[in-house]
Amino acid sequence: MASAVVRVAGRRLSQQSASGAPVLLRQMFEPKSCTYTYLLGDRESREAVLIDPVLETAHRDAQLIKELGLKLLYAVNTHCHADHITGTGVLRSLLPGCQSVISRLSGAQADLHIGEGDSIRFGRFALETRASPGHTPGCVTFVLNDQSMAFTGDALLIRGCGRTDFQQGCAKTLYHSVHEKIFTLPGNCLIYPAHDYHGLTVSTVEEERTLNPRLTLSCEEFIKVMDNLNLPKPQQIDIAVPANMRCGVQTPPS
């Protein structure tokens, strides 16, 4: 693992982000899979991280990064997605020096593999990795070092959560992940999910702790709900999962 991805105590991280300009944040949307991609950058060092890029919008993301004068260090996936092909492969070719990152528990290839407690540094900032399995075994949530925002992937959505009926998902595991790894964050911590299907963009920990119709249930009730969703499988799953297992180390097929 490269030295830029290291285990760092939360207190030290908070001190790093307490001075200077706030983190640069851009939320971008891909309409076919209703996926949010997040660009975070340090306004001083110009180092940046991109979370959950999508193949169809990778050139858009690269153009924005260039326009803002940023250097993309990492293209990060919160998990091995089933509804779209990751844009990490294209971004690595468009932006030399960018490395792909994913949880080691995903089983996917990447330049760097991370796990619980690892931190991804960019300038004065860092993202803490919190394992949040359940939607898939390799799901992670990324928490900015001052705990002002969390990027929850498919583990926690706005008034919802990721499904648990494929990719070795487990409703009980997801319930405990959200309650133990996300709902323990400060109430005003902003929640940025990987998807939204209703035009919503951001929530907070307190909102989801009190208003999320699934995750305010008991664990037993939650499992019953998740086991009876009867959703169709994602349209791209047979193409997306094999491509995403390469996680951008090899350019995905177009």
Curated annotation (Swiss-Prot):
Its EC number is 1.13.11.18. The modification N6-succinyllysine is found at K32, K172. It is found in: Cytoplasm; Nucleus; Mitochondrion matrix. Fe cation binds at H79, H135, D154. Gene3D superfamilies: Ribonuclease Z/Hydroxyacylglutathione hydrolase-like (3.60.15.10). Homodimer. Monomer. Interacts with TST. May interact with RELA. This is Persulfide dioxygenase ETHE1, mitochondrial. It comes from Mus musculus.
